[in-house]
Amino acid sequence: MKVTQHLWFEKDMEAAIGFYASLIPGSSVHWVTPIMADTPSGPAGSVRSASFTLGDQRYMAIEAGPLDPFNHSFSIVVECETQGDLDRLWNALREGGSVEQCGWLKDRWGLSWQIAPTRLGELMSDPDPDKVRRVTAAMLKMVKLDIAPLEAAAAG
């Protein structure tokens, strides 16, 4: 048994998944193909589907016109080892999109992402509740997450 997330794009699916795959090491687009039968979304050939991998996570996608737009109930979380990787990914994904609090952003296609340092999970799960409160307070003041201030908050 395999579990795979599936994304519904109104348009520009191939551009979106190609862009995502170019940003994350170990990613690739496996295939993009038209659905050669009439569907509720359009005539044969007008709807396309795809398979792609981001890092070690496989996804499927469809480009089938408007349905429900992406929203915060689904996001892709990327944990970055370094601030440089976090900054690079954040800056690329936010181009043409919008940024939000605590490392969240929406890309130009409306898909929500959480770009976070790997270290954040370690800091947030520390057994010292005072440390966790300080880290949380620091994080809540940030839009793009920054490892150094989070580490400083943890240190007190």
Located regions from the model:
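Core segments of cupin and vicinal oxygen chelate
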Residues: L7-D56
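Short, solvent-exposed beta-strand edge segments and adjacent coil->beta transition regions
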Residues: K2-T4, N71-S75
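Intrinsically disordered, low-complexity acidic/polar segments
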Residues: E14-A16, A61, F70
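A charge-rich, low-complexity, intrinsically flexible signal that marks solvent-exposed coils, linkers
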Residues: P40-S41, H72, A155-G156
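Vicinal oxygen chelate
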Residues: H30, S51-T53, M60-A64, D68, ...
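Short hydrophobic/aromatic beta-strand micro-patches
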Residues: W8, V77-E79
